[in-house]
């Protein structure tokens, strides 16, 4: 993978079917390429979440689907690339820097769905902005344990989902 110490820019050029000079035109180092890959993955995740937010389903269904879409997509990206997985856990602060734009987009999507839920009488919440940020940071906080399989590891999916739904909808005062 890109961040392997033995991987050279020449290896990356061969794998990407680009010339080494072409790579150096856009990237200064392997590290820059790695961060571009992380950013690209986050853009795809953002698009996936936007598609869920735009679905013609109830706001409560959207919230749960957005949460699972995010967690499952991050887990899939991390496991698809073993080095990315190792670096995700080891280099979290660097990844955090790249994630700022994604985080802002995600909070806006949560706000839109929460607002829709309030307008339709599905949720009773006082402060949509604060609630969207709290949902975002709660989901972000369980990301690593979810990826590592620590959340609901001894439960079947249906039971685990029931707990998640009860927690999320309890917090949003679903009517």
Where are each of the predicted segments found?
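Active-site loops and adjacent core secondary-structure elements that bind or stabilize anionic groups
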Residues: 1
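Helix-turn-helix
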Residues: 4-32, 36
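Hydrophobic/aromatic residues within well-ordered alpha-helical segments
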Residues: 30, 37, 41, 45, ...
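Hydrophobic alpha-helical connector segments
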Residues: 36, 40, 50-76, 131-135, ...
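Secondary-structure edge/capping motif, primarily at the C-terminal ends of alpha-helices
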Residues: 52, 81-88, 146-150
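Short secondary-structure transition hinges
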Residues: 71-109, 119
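C-terminal peripheral helix-coil segments that are non-catalytic and often amphipathic
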Residues: 108-120, 133, 137-175
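Membrane-interface starts of transmembrane alpha-helices
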Residues: 124, 128-132
